[in-house]
């Protein structure tokens, strides 16, 4: 746990306890991935959890997880020291043999808060983004509960499927970047480098790398996104973000 900032330890420990208490013997393993175990958590980084279970969850179990996680996850617009929790559950047997897109059993994320308040319970679904997530998590993760390394539970994921998932995800991203400018710009930068190198690179590093090879106008906006990601308050209202989003998307399509 020493690689993860100490002020997040209590959140991580509470998530771990919630999963053990309510999933019981169905729980195979809990793993952290993303910036928390790669380049280090940034001011606005999520805590990313991948949870592997052996059997489907009931709606009641999912509802309990939502009720228990909500109080310990940062809310959008909140100024507390909590971090956003993003938690994905998969069924191990549904990963073997591998098929793209994979099945997602459950998802918790703060962008779903309004739906949770209306009684929404995430159902099993195919999720193209999950291919990217699993590819990233398998390459680098930290086991916080369970007897198996994640690499033992997941099959090999062809990079051709990662490329397909990136192209699928980019289309949705460029249609929904408003009010999420920083994340959208840097995610596109990371997609570009992933397509080029086969590696999932931290967003700030990806942003700096793509900025270096971008025209000045777009370079400046990308570097603004990096500064925002690192904690600076950036006002996007007067920036022509759509121009840089389109530039990055066109660059991605050429790879």
From Swiss-Prot:
Q: Name one GO biological process term.
A: response to antibiotic
Catalysed reactions listed for this entry? spectinomycin + ATP = 9-O-adenylylspectinomycin + diphosphate
Task: Classify the source by domain of life.
Answer: Bacteria
| Chain segments annotated as coiled-coil in the UniProt record | none
Listed GO MF terms = ATP binding; nucleotidyltransferase activity
Q: What InterPro entries does the record tag this protein with?
A: AadA_C, NT_sf, Polymerase_NTP_transf_dom
Keyword tags: Antibiotic resistance, ATP-binding, Nucleotide-binding, Nucleotidyltransferase, Plasmid, Transferase
Disulphide bridges, residue numbers:
none
* Matching Gene3D superfamilies: Beta Polymerase, domain 2
Keyword Nuclease tagged = no
Q: Does the keyword Coiled coil apply?
A: no
Which CDD domains does this chain map to? NT_KNTase_like
The task this protein performs is described as: Mediates bacterial resistance to the antibiotic spectinomycin but not streptomycin.
Write the protein's name: Spectinomycin 9-adenylyltransferase
